C-alpha cells in the first residue's frame, strides 16, 4: 500500500497587523506568512517512502500553526473531479472545432479536513504551492502562495481581511414569482417520508457537469492554462458544497468559445439563458451532460450576476448562466453553486431560513462573502423536489473503471479492489464497512445500497424502488445482491392518467399537460376547432416540415401537428412558444389523439 506523504510546514510566522498586500484574492489588509517545506514520511524501520508514481500524491498531510496553535491538515485528491470521458473543446481561428481528451486524472485538486476537528473542511489546489481555504475551529482561513522570488512563502488570512471589490449587492435574477406558495412548502415540510423515500434520498447521486466559457471571458485571461486552472478550482469547490445533498459533481467537459460565441450573448440574463438552453439541446451525443453552465464576461443588466431555470434536472432546462464578476474563485464558485441549486428545485431562502455559517448558499442576495452551506429549508425543498420528480439521470454513477488512477480508500468512491468506501476514518458512520481497508466487516454482506439493510441483503421480492407513476414499474430486490435492479418502465401504449393518455417511453404525454408545461397552470388544450388550422400547412399551422416546406395535416392527423392551447374559462386558439426551440410547439410523440390512437411521426395511429 502506498503510504501517505507527510509534509511538515516549518513555520516562521510574521503577523502583519494593519499591513496590506495585494494577493490573487485582492487587497488583503491582515495576514500571516508561512514557509512550507516538504519532508518525506518514513515507513516502518526508518525506510523513506519511495517516490510517487504520479506527479501529485493521492493523500497528503500538512502540519502548521494557526494563531500560534499547531494543526494538521489532511488532504485527499478529489478523484471524482473529472469523468472518465472528460473532454475539452476550443475553436481554431477559422472556426474549426478542436476537441481533445486530455490526461487529467493526475491532477492537483484536493479536499480535506483538520485532524481531530469534527466540523472542519478544506478545499485546496496544490498545483503551484497551496491555494484554497480550510475551516478551523469555526473560522474559515484562506491560504495562497506569495509571489516572491526564490521563496516558498504563503499567506494565511480571513475573508474579513479582504477588501471588497464592489460594495453593490449582487443578485440572482430568479424572482419570487417563480416560487411555490409558502403554504404549500410548509405543508410538504411537515410530511414524513416513507422508508422507500428515505432509501432513495440516501442513495448517492451524480451530476455530469458541462462548463462553457464565452469569448469575452476567454479574452479576459492571459492564457488557456490560467483559464483552465481557474475553472478547475471552481468545480473543486462546487463539489464540496453538494456533499450535504448527497451529490457528487463530476466535470464531463469544458468548452471554450475561443473563436466566437456560439449563441447570442445579451445583457438580459433571461435572453442569454434561453439561447444557451437552445444551444445545449442540440449538443451531439459525445457531449451529453446532466447540467451545463455558461460563464460569461458580459455585464448583465442591473446587479444580476446569475440566472437559472428552477427544478429542471435531467431536462432541456438543466442550465444556468453566471457572470464572471469577481476575480475571487470562491465567489464565482459560490454563485455557480447557487444557480445549480435552482436547477435542483431549490428557491431562494426566506427570512426564517438559517445555516450555521451565513450567508447560506440560496440567499437571495449574492454578497462579497462566500457561501458555505445549504440551509435546512434548502435541504428539505430539494428533497421534496427529488421525491416529486424522481429525475433519472442523477442515478447513473460512474463505473469503477471510470476512476483511471490508483484507488484511494476513504474517498467515498468504491473503486477496483474495494468492497465498500464510507469515507475517511473521521467521516465514516458505517457499521458494515472497515474505513481503514475499504473491505466489508466479517459479518457484513453489503454496506449502503438500496437492497442492503443492517449489513445483509434484503429478501427477494422486497420493494426497493416504488413506481413513481402510471408509466413506471416497481423494482424488487433479488435477495442475492445489494443493488436495486435497473429501473424498468411500463410498456408503451398502457393507459395512464385515468385513460387521458397512453404511456410512451416512461411518460404519459397529454396535450393538456403540454399546454400547462409551456404556458402555466391556467391553460388547457384548445377546442377541437383550433386543430383544423393544421390542414393549412402554413408557417404556424402544419403537421411536419420536409426540406424546409411546411406539410399540412390530413384531417385524421390534425391533432398530431401544431399544438393549440387556450386559457381556462376563455375562448381562443393559442400556439405556445417554448423557450427550448420552435419545434416543441408541436404535439409530442406518443400523445393521445383519439381513443386507442396516439401521435407517431405526425400521424394519428393505433396503439
Curated annotation (Swiss-Prot):
Chief subcellular location: secreted
Cofactor note: Binds 1 zinc ion per subunit.
SMART domains, A to Z: ACR, DISIN
EC number: 3.4.24.-
Residues that carry a glycan: 220, 270, 301, 434, 522
Residues annotated as domain Peptidase M12B: 205-398
Keyword tRNA processing: no
Cross-referenced Pfam families: ADAM_CR (PF08516), Disintegrin (PF00200), Pep_M12B_propep (PF01562), Reprolysin (PF01421)
Tissue expression as described in the entry: Expressed by the venom gland.
UniProt cross-references to InterPro entries, sorted A to Z: ADAM_Cys-rich, Disintegrin_dom, Disintegrin_dom_sf, MetalloPept_cat_dom_sf, Peptidase_M12B, Peptidase_M12B_N, Reprolysin_adamalysin
Cofactor(s) the protein needs: Zn(2+)
Keywords noted in UniProt: Calcium, Cell adhesion impairing toxin, Disulfide bond, Glycoprotein, Hemostasis impairing toxin, Hydrolase, Metal-binding, Metalloprotease, Platelet aggregation inhibiting toxin, Protease, Secreted, Signal, Toxin, Zinc, Zymogen
Disulfide bonds: 314-393, 353-377, 355-360, 409-438, 420-433, 422-428, 432-455, 446-452, 451-477, 464-484, 471-503, 496-508, 515-565, 530-573, 543-553, 560-599, 593-604
Motif annotated as D/ECD-tripeptide, chain positions: 470-472
Entry GO MF terms: metal ion binding; metalloendopeptidase activity; toxin activity
Subunit structure: Monomer.
Protein name: Zinc metalloproteinase-disintegrin-like atrase-A
Amino acid at each position: 500500500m502506498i503510504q501517505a506523504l507527510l509534509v511538515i510546514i516549518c513555520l516562521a510566522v510574521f503577523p502583519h497587523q494593519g499591513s496590506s498586500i495585494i494577493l490573487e484574492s485582492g487587497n488583503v489588509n491582515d495576514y500571516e506568512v508561512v514557509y512550507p517545506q516538504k519532508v518525506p514520511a518514513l515507513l516502518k524501520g526508518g525506510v523513506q517512502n519511495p517516490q510517487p508514481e504520479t506527479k501529485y500524491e493521492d493523500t497528503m498531510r500538512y502540519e502548521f500553526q494557526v494563531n500560534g496553535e499547531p494543526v494538521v491538515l489532511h488532504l485527499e485528491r478529489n478523484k471524482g473531479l473529472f469523468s472518465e470521458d472528460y473532454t475539452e473543446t476550443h475553436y481554431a481561428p477559422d472556426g474549426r472545432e478542436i476537441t481533445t481528451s486530455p490526461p487529467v486524472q493526475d491532477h492537483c485538486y484536493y479536499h480535506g479536513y483538520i485532524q481531530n476537528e469534527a466540523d472542519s473542511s478544506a478545499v485546496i489546489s496544490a498545483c503551484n504551492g497551496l491555494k484554497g481555504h480550510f475551516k478551523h475551529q469555526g473560522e474559515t482561513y484562506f491560504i495562497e502562495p506569495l509571489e516572491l522570488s526564490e521563496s516558498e512563502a504563503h499567506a494565511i488570512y480571513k475573508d474579513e481581511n479582504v477588501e471588497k471589490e464592489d460594495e453593490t449587492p449582487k443578485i440572482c435574477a430568479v424572482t419570487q414569482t417563480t416560487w411555490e406558495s409558502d403554504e404549500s412548502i410548509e405543508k410538504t415540510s411537515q410530511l414524513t417520508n416513507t422508508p422507500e423515500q428515505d432509501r432513495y434520498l440516501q442513495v448517492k447521486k451524480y451530476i455530469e457537469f458541462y462548463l462553457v466559457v464565452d469569448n469575452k471571458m476567454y479574452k479576459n485571461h492571459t492564457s488557456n492554462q490560467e483559464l483552465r486552472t481557474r475553472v478547475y478550482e471552481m468545480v473543486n469547490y462546487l463539489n464540496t458544497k453538494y456533499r450535504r445533498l448527497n451529490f457528487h459533481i463530476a466535470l464531463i467537459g469544458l468548452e471554450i468559445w475561443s473563436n466566437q460565441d456560439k449563441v447570442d450573448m445579451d445583457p438580459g440574463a433571461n435572453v442569454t439563458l434561453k439561447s444557451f438552453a437552445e444551444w445545449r439541446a442540440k449538443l451531439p451525443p459525445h457531449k451529453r451532460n446532466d447540467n451545463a453552465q455558461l460563464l460569461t464576461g458580459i455585464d448583465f443588466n442591473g446587479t444580476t450576476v446569475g440566472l437559472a431555470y428552477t427544478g429542471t434536472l435531467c431536462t432541456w432546462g438543466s442550465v444556468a448562466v453566471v457572470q464572471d464578476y469577481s476575480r475571487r474563485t470562491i465567489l464565482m464558485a459560490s454563485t455557480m453553486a447557487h444557480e445549480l441549486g435552482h436547477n435542483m428545485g431549490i428557491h431562494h431562502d426566506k427570512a426564517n431560513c438559517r445555516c450555521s455559517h451565513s450567508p447560506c448558499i440560496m440567499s437571495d442576495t449574492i454578497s462579497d462573502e462566500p457561501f458555505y452551506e445549504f440551509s435546512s429549508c434548502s435541504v428539505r425543498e430539494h428533497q421534496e423536489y427529488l421525491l416529486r420528480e424522481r429525475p433519472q439521470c442523477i442515478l447513473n454513477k460512474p463505473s469503477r473503471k471510470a476512476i483511471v488512477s490508483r484507488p484511494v480508500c476513504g474517498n467515498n468512491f468504491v473503486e477496483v479492489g474495494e468492497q465498500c468506501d464510507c469515507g475517511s476514518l473521521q467521516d465514516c458512520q458505517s457499521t458494515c464497512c472497515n474505513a481503514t481497508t475499504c473491505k466489508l466487516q466479517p459479518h457484513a454482506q453489503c454496506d449502503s445500497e438500496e437492497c442492503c439493510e443492517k449489513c445483509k441483503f434484503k429478501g427477494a421480492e422486497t420493494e426497493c424502488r416504488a413506481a413513481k407513476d402510471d408509466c413506471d414499474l416497481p423494482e424488487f430486490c433479488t435477495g442475492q445482491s445489494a443493488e436495486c435492479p435497473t429501473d424498468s418502465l411500463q410498456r408503451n401504449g398502457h393507459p395512464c392518467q385515468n385513460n387521458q393518455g397512453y404511456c410512451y417511453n416512461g411518460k404519459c404525454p397529454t396535450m393538456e399537460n403540454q399546454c400547462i408545461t409551456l404556458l402555466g397552470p391556467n391553460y388547457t388544450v384548445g377546442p377541437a376547432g383550433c386543430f383544423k388550422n393544421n390542414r393549412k400547412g402554413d408557417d404556424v399551422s402544419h403537421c411536419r416540415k420536409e426540406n424546409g416546406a411546411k406539410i399540412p395535416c390530413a384531417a385524421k392527423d390534425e391533432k398530431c401537428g401544431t399544438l393549440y392551447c387556450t386559457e381556462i374559462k376563455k375562448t381562443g386558439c393559442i400556439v405556445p412558444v417554448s423557450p427550448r426551440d420552435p419545434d416543441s410547439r408541436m404535439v409530442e410523440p406518443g400523445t393521445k389523439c383519439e381513443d386507442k390512437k396516439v401521435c407517431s411521426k405526425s400521424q394519428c395511429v393505433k396503439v
